[in-house]
Design a protein with these regions (language model features):
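Active-site region of glycoside hydrolase catalytic domains
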Residues: 2, 37-46
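Active-site clefts of carbohydrate-active enzymes
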Residues: 2-26
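Generic alpha-helical structural context detector
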Residues: 7-10, 38-41, 89, 93
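Carbohydrate-interacting/catalytic domains
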Residues: 28-30, 44, 49, 53-226
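Conserved interdomain hinge at the start of the Helicase C-terminal
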Residues: 33-34
């Protein structure tokens, strides 16, 4: 499916761009935009980035002109140093360098705040977690959509690919350097240690393997198993 469907955050047919710049605090939602771009490039599909996103265009309104802002009128209007441009550049490089992000199978992952009860994020704003797996390579993406509170918890990973104490390398964070991100190592969960709630309403037990992750508000991380 990922080879045939184009995915996007916004386009010229929508009434407003995905990125919102509040008049009173223009950069309040910058991290949400870079988080969304990272998810766009990591999820299944062919990512399509609407022009101007990388330059922070944020028009809204009922007329077509509201989301078709002119980018080329001023001299040197395209800023290669813009933080959004740099984030897109980094995420695109990660996608290009990781075949699992282009061709891998996709699995949404249950999460836990206490290390015992796991399930899909049931609160808003929540935490999005998924894996892309190709052969023996697993990429884990975790996004904390809460703009105010951080998140510390665990994400289930593939049991067969992740022996206890497996470590993950941080390929991307939209908020800080890779060295500052707290992640792993993988923990073993015996059958009597976990309760896994599935999207269809079913409940199962372990054994399972879980990856500890700590995220800042509006932070997304892309991780690769070593």
């Amino acid at each position: 499916i990922g080879r045939y469907f184009v995915t996007f955050l916004d386009n010229h047919d929508q009434g407003q761009r995905f990125y919102y710049s509040a008049p009173a605090n223009p950069h309040a939602y910058d991290d949400q935009l870079t988080m969304a771009v990272a998810c766009l490039f990591a999820l299944q599909g062919i990512p399509c980035l609407y022009y101007g996103t990388e330059q922070g265009l944020h028009g809204s309104g009922n007329s077509p002109e509201a989301v078709r802002e002119a980018l080329w009128g001023a001299p040197n209007a395209f800023d290669r140093g813009h933080p959004f441009y740099q984030a897109v550049r980094q995420v695109a490089a990660v996608r290009a360098g990781q075949p699992a992000l282009r061709y891998g199978r996709q699995y949404f992952r249950p999460i836990s705040g206490n290390g015992a009860q796991f399930g899909m994020s049931a609160f808003t704003p929540g935490v999005l977690a998924f894996s892309r797996i190709l052969d023996d390579a697993e990429i884990v993406v975790v996004a904390n959509t809460d703009p105010q509170a951080g998140w510390q918890g665990q994400v289930l990973v593939d049991l067969a690919l992740n022996p206890p104490m497996t470590t993950y390398r941080v390929l991307f964070s939209n908020r800080r350097s890779a060295a500052d991100v707290q992640v792993g190592p993988v923990q073993h969960k015996a059958a009597d240690m976990v309760e896994i709630h599935h999207a269809d309403g079913g409940v199962s037990a372990g054994p399972a393997r879980a990856l500890p992750v700590t995220l800042w508000p509006s932070e997304v991380v892309i991780l690769r198993r070593l």
